[in-house]
Amino acid sequence: MAKSKGARIIITLECTECRTNSDKRSAGVSRYTSTKNRRNTTNRLELKKFCTHCNKHTVHKEIK
């Protein structure tokens, strides 16, 4: 029998300031990968992480 898909999924977090800010340290968009339990956290995650392109801590939002 095949196993059912688990509750944990891999998500991608993207910096919100890299998309809008033109005067940053280097070109590109900062992205992190993480896991979340889709049964406990149904809405999209927002975490403060360090952005290497902006060179500061910024809000990273979950993207599809």
UniProtKB/Swiss-Prot annotation:
Family annotation (InterPro entries): Ribosomal_bL33, Ribosomal_bL33_CS, Ribosomal_bL33_sf, Ribosomal_zn-bd
One term of GO molecular function: structural constituent of ribosome
Keywords associated with the record: Ribonucleoprotein, Ribosomal protein
Tagged with keyword Endoplasmic reticulum: no
Domain of life: Bacteria
Any GO BP annotation: translation
Entry's Gene Ontology cellular component terms: cytoplasm; ribonucleoprotein complex; ribosome
Pfam families associated with the record: Ribosomal_L33
Record family assignment: Belongs to the bacterial ribosomal protein bL33 family.
UniProt name for this protein: Large ribosomal subunit protein bL33
Organism, as annotated: Nostoc punctiforme (strain ATCC 29133 / PCC 73102)
